Amino acid sequence: MWKFAIHSQQPFCWQQLCNRRHLYVGNVQQQTHLELLDAAPTRSDDEWLQAKPYEKVPGPGTWQVLSYFLPGGKQYNTNLIQMNRRMREWYGDIYRFPGLMGKQDVIFTYNPNDFELTYRNEGVWPIRIGLESFTYYRKVHRPEVFGSIGGLVSEQGKDWAHIRNKVNPVQMRVQNVRQNLPQIDQISREFVDKLDTLRDPVTHILNDNFHEQLKMWAFESISFVALNTRMGLLSDRPDPNAARLAEHMTDFFNYSFKYDVQPSIWPYYKTPGFKKFLQTYDKITEITTAYIDEAIKRFEIEKDSGNECVLQQLLSLNKKVAVVMAMYMLMAGIDTTSSAFVTILYHLARNPHKQRQLHRERRRILPDSDEPLTPENTKNMPYLRACIKECMRITSITPGNFRIATKDLVLSGYRVPRGEGVLMGVLELSNSEKYFGQSGQFMPERWLKADTDPDVKACPAARSRNPFVYLAFGFGPRTCIGKRIAELEMETLLTRLLRRYQVSWLAEMPLQYESNIILSPHGIYVQVRAAC
């Protein structure tokens, strides 16, 4: 879940800073050599020699691309889903998006065999470009704070593996994440209690403030995991530092879109706006570090109080690791989780029959709505988890997965040299009849392994047998590290909300999305009424 997409009005390759043998990290003068690219031998086998040359990959020319995205162009004001769909219609299942402003090309592919080849050949150090501004901030602007500790989004090669290997056991272990359930449940209860203030008293339609408050729910939840602190963001009197941090996180998303996604001259000239961005990073670092320092004092007093929380385990590795990971969790775990939850709510609101089936499962788990959620009573929630997977199949907030090829590859019959960017259009395939029967239907039953109710029959035949067609959280060593936390948060809030309410979609048109760092929903015409 914690992945960043790109704005469709700006070509994807504007984000890529690779040439075929070197990767420039952070758009800075310092060049990070990825030895694995040079170490991979040049191919001379029959498959490679018989494949079509890279230059023959279909696709638009540079000026044609520019015309697409200018006002009046065919792709102007389209979101990422629309852009992918149109380009595929025009150029087929593989095409080359030309590099602009000195950047490299990117290969877009919609062939699951290409997905598998790319993933299977990425090695132990997969390369995926992340937030370049954060790399610059850590390595150039504030090296005295972060030292050699890198972030999961922005590091590559050995540096990435070093931090990932440290934090994997902390954030991917089920019991580590599930120990946060009591507090995550309490936060979800507080949000559901607040719903009456977020809907019209007569029509019961959610108001414009709903999504912003949902972000505060996501912020409150992830900050407890990252900082072991309740911020009070759902109350009328949040902690002053928490309120400041929330404002700075909003600024971060706005600045990141402008300087990490859109074309910018900041790598060559530090504009006043980019300097404000660095100040925002400073404030986030300052407040995050202060919360961690408070937690350290608290942990000293509460020694031997039971299982160590996520923050304690990160601190046992290194305080700098804890600061970097806390910042990463905050940056990656707010808009992504809240936007995904809106999408889930939308699909359930449009499918009342499935919602009723889910409500029956909720009542079995919580006969008494005031009963707390526990690891025991949340083990058996197959239909809820199937609903979440089906929502993410139909509308993922990150409709593609990106990698730099670390070996020479043959994709769909074309040579793709190592060092080239490859964008795998997963969302297009997961909405295709070729891979999912009745792909246009909301059918959670396709994800069930067995019948869960006399009226709920498993239908695995409607699910693709190819595991590379549905990859909501990525694949391999760079699988989304926030997967388990995001799932816990969404499962908990969905359980609480649908135990008390039923939701309906009132608009004629489907939910709309706009592209930012991720695909963000807007125009949420959901009615929330008391459940029968």
From Swiss-Prot:
Name of the top EC class for this enzyme: oxidoreductase
Keyword Transit peptide in record: yes
Keyword terms: Heme, Iron, Metal-binding, Mitochondrion, Monooxygenase, Oxidoreductase, Transit peptide
PROSITE patterns reported in the protein's UniProt record: CYTOCHROME_P450 (PS00086)
InterPro entries: CYP11_CYP27_families, Cyt_P450, Cyt_P450_CS, Cyt_P450_E_grp-I, Cyt_P450_sf
Cofactors: heme
UniProt subcellular location: Mitochondrion
GO CC terms in record: mitochondrion
Pfam families (alphabetical): p450 (PF00067)
Highest taxon listed in the record's lineage: Eukaryota
Cited CDD domains: CYP24A1-like (cd11054)
Keyword Hydrolase: no
EC numbers: 1.14.-.-
Binding-site residues, heme: 480
GO MF term set: heme binding; iron ion binding; monooxygenase activity; oxidoreductase activity, acting on paired donors, with incorporation or reduction of molecular oxygen
Function: Probably involved in steroid hormones biosynthesis.
Family named by the database record: Belongs to the cytochrome P450 family.
Protein name per UniProt: Cytochrome P450 12b1, mitochondrial
